[in-house]
């Protein structure tokens, strides 16, 4: 995805929606996944009224799976999908990588199913409430500085603020 247009002022402005693919000797890792491909197909059907504030600008080919394939990644080889949090512009990769273990803070996962009124529009439940997802839950400070492969290359840090269970 290139960006999201927002109309909170008199002029639109763009917000980048990045996601990351890390090639690691122990297995590929995706961090976040950008927007779900469904917003490129029918953004109103997928996000509903949220598009009045956040207008996803995306072609179908911009989704994380197609982009990963475009650089030679076999999506079956993605070993982990790390979710910084489960907001709509980060959860597009959930369930798209068939063998991936999805790493998320337990606090974030639980909150995403029952957010407060202000945060609720940021969570699109159908993006992460899917069958057959292998979740690995981290437990905030108890698992802080979680070393994914035990080699110091990818370390997950509990960083609440933007969302209750945000991790970096």
Q: Residue locations for each model-derived region?
A:
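Metallo-beta-lactamase
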Residues: 55-77, 105-158
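Active-site neighborhood of phospho(di)ester-bond hydrolases with catalytic His/Asp-centered motifs
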Residues: 30-33, 79-85, 104-105, 157-161
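Active-site metal-binding motif and surrounding structural segment of the metallo-beta-lactamase
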Residues: 46-104
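Residues that flank catalytic or metal-binding motifs in active/ligand-binding sites
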Residues: 14-18, 98, 131, 144, ...
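Short Gly/Pro-enriched turn/cap motifs at secondary-structure boundaries
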Residues: 9-13, 157-162
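Short, solvent-exposed loop/turn and secondary-structure capping segments
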Residues: 41-42, 94-96, 114-115
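Short, glycine/acidic-enriched loop or turn micro-motifs at the edges of active sites
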Residues: 35, 88, 165
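Conserved beta-strand hairpin/beta-sheet module of binuclear metal-dependent hydrolase folds
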Residues: 2-66, 168
């Amino acid at each position: 995805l290139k960006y999201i247009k927002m109309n909170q002022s008199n002029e639109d402005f763009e917000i980048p929606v990045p996601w990351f693919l890390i090639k690691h000797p122990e297995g590929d890792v995706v961090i976040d996944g950008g927007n779900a491909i469904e917003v490129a197909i029918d953004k109103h059907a997928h996000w509903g009224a949220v598009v009045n504030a956040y207008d996803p600008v995306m072609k179908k080919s911009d989704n994380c799976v197609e982009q990963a394939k475009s650089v030679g990644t076999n999506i079956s080889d993605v070993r982990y999908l790390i979710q910084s949090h489960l907001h709509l512009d980060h959860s597009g990769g959930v369930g798209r990588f068939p063998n991936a273990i999805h790493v998320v803070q337990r606090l974030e996962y639980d909150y995403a199913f029952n957010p407060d009124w202000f945060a609720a529009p940021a969570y699109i439940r159908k993006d992460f409430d899917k069958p057959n997802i292998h979740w690995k839950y981290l437990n905030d400070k108890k698992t802080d500085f979680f070393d994914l492969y035990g080699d110091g290359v990818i370390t997950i840090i509990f960083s609440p603020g933007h969302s209750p269970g945000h991790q970096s």
